[in-house]
Amino acid sequence: MTEPITPEIVAQHGLKPDEYQRILEHLGRTPTLTELGVFSVMWSEHCSYKSSRVHLKTFPTSGPRVLQGPGENAGVVDLGDGLAAAFKMESHNHPSYIEPYQGAATGVGGILRDVFTMGARPIASLNALRFGDPSHPRTAYLLEGVVAGIGGYGNCMGVPTVGGEVAFHPSYNGNCLVNAFTLGILPADKIFRGTAAGVGNPVMYVGAKTGRDGIHGATMASAEFDASTEEKRPTVQVGDPFMEKLLLEACLELFQTDAVVGIQDMGAAGLTSSSVEMAGRGGNGLDLFLDQVPLREEGMTPYEILLSESQERMLLVAAEGKEELVRSICEKWDLDVAVIGRVTASGRWRAHWRGAVVADLPVDPLTEGAPKYHRPMTPHPALPALHAFDLATLPEPADLGAALVRLLARPTIASKEWVYRQYDHMVRLVGAVRPGGDAAVVRLAVSHDAHAHKGIALSVGVNGRFCFLDPYLGAMHAVAECARNIACVGGEPIAITDCLNFGNPEKPEIMWQFAECVRGIGDACRAFGTPVVSGNVSLYNETEGQGILPTPTVGMVGLVEPVERTCHSTFRDAGDVIALVGSLQGEVGGSEYLSAEHGKEAGRPPALDLAREKAVQETVRRAVRAGLLSSAHDCSEGGLAVALAESCMMHEVPSDGSKPAWIGCAVRIPFPVRKDFVLFGEDASRILVSLPKENAARFVDLAQQCGAPVIRLGAVGGDRLEIQGALSVPVEELARAWRDGIPAVLRRDAAHAGATAPV
């Protein structure tokens, strides 16, 4: 007997009453429970982008290097000489909060599949992580679990994690963020897409068996958390990186044949989403025969088979007559493989089970016909008072040196060495610079010797405080800082991906934040010539009604040529000249200093002049390529004083356990406003450089040609950071505070009896 569809069942599936009414209108009848489950996942925010799609369409998505823009598993850009890069960033926020190790691990697995589904071999990963207040009882538990999950999966796959960012803020206490980025390399003329083309072609299942893990994961990722969060552990997928490694190699071998017509990762919403999306892109129908799906558990129902999010699975459309070729390659790699369906001309998506049709739905309402909302928007009501706050009324610290030490110990600013030492960043020997700098640089020579002179620069980042205080400007800052980081290693930005993390879009102030951030990213990308080629939206990042800071993470890719001429972020030689490319405004609105020293998150983010920003970047990029610089370091969180301190400290402790290496500096800074504002303000468009004295005149000439201001500050040398008239601190003391920031979080947690306290 068919189970009746009640309002309670509709609500359990995350559908609103008006959405269910639309389903009835599309079908002209009551859906079965299986069909309701299909609509539930396909109309979830995670799959349909129903609240965000109207805004995302405003992004610039085309350009001379774009080979594949948004809408596929990953974006693809042309690197020249017949080579291309596929890349994307994806969130796994909700699963990682519920079960941090598996949530983060399967997030890595999912983004790797997105990239190699395009025909690319993944060569590098990054991540952008957000955790709650360091003193919160759950923060260390999540930090340890997430980092272990990322390292555990990526290390087993043999894909190096070469960079990223980690930040802490109380708004993430109940909702951590795990944004995973992967880039792969492929021939520019061999891109594979997720389309069900060719009526009569077989639909084949490849990979791990299907179990009950992850059922309704997409729906869970489209809802707020509450007191029942711990009960949602069964919706978190379980990953097997060794199975994924076999799947990767099998797919890359299949791509060398003529057997693959289309291929799609079974990610969110599993077999349902992958098959529906392939049918939608191909403009065709699809018949699935669920009896043929390889199962890991007994007694699974069609509903469970279709909605399972078991990992390490692919759906491919093979050329008719090539089934045995696909089968032989997959069996060679010890993978399950089965023909489970056919492409049809019906325009309908059908699922068969034991001789009966258990779902028969038109494809269009599940894809392009899904709801699209123009939700109400209004500025956040707290902003006028925050903008009006008089920063000049704040007291100046009595000891600026002590303030700098405290700032360096803040986990957001502190060394991330504890994190990246758990990642195998040396595997495949692609890294041209070690983790800890402004941008990661990977060589292409390991995979393609003919391209030995080329490298790729990678950067991820965003400042959530800036985006809260001014979403439009904050989002522009995210793009500008990623581009600045790439300029610091001599790279030319070419494209971005994004991961847009926000709270509940049904709240007008959250929807306004989202729309303004999208507008800011779009305008900045147009200015830098960096189209948006892929991305992800993660909404409902709220717990008990408390939302996260708006966090539109940007991941940028740049071309470094020649890769031998890249640059590091730390001072190198005593006697080198230190200079600031940019100006000194002392803008502390939304800064880490304001929060750390005064407990305030107020004011406006620093002004951003895109013409000035581009001039600063062009100056440094050309100087790096000309070999003029010893170091280049972006001034961001913590301002100029933190940038100077970081430049004094090595990012790697010697493996023999000897005293860490560092070098001091002595500088004289003009103070147009209060000293603390100049030292710790996070003014935009600034890069701190060091260079041999003999290169100084050429560098100043270059800056003048590019239209960028340069301020000569002082020289590298000694064992103290000395800022005349402001502070003098031993670099050893700075390094001790900086290196201990994150270990201190873990020690604090160990001191609590309830280290893994429930939510």
UniProtKB/Swiss-Prot annotation:
Top-rank taxon: Bacteria
Reaction catalysis annotation: N(2)-formyl-N(1)-(5-phospho-beta-D-ribosyl)glycinamide + L-glutamine + ATP + H2O = 2-formamido-N(1)-(5-O-phospho-beta-D-ribosyl)acetamidine + L-glutamate + ADP + phosphate + H(+)
Residues annotated for ATP binding in this entry: Y49, K88, D498, G535
Pfam families given in the database record: AIRS (PF00586), AIRS_C (PF02769), FGAR-AT_linker (PF18072)
Top-level enzyme category: ligase
Annotated catalytic residues: H46, H92 (proton acceptor)
Enzyme Commission identifier(s): 6.3.5.3
An example Gene Ontology biological process: 'de novo' IMP biosynthetic process
Family, as annotated: Belongs to the FGAMS family.
Subunit text: Monomer. Part of the FGAM synthase complex composed of 1 PurL, 1 PurQ and 2 PurS subunits.
Name of protein: Phosphoribosylformylglycinamidine synthase subunit PurL
Protein's organism: Anaeromyxobacter sp. (strain K)
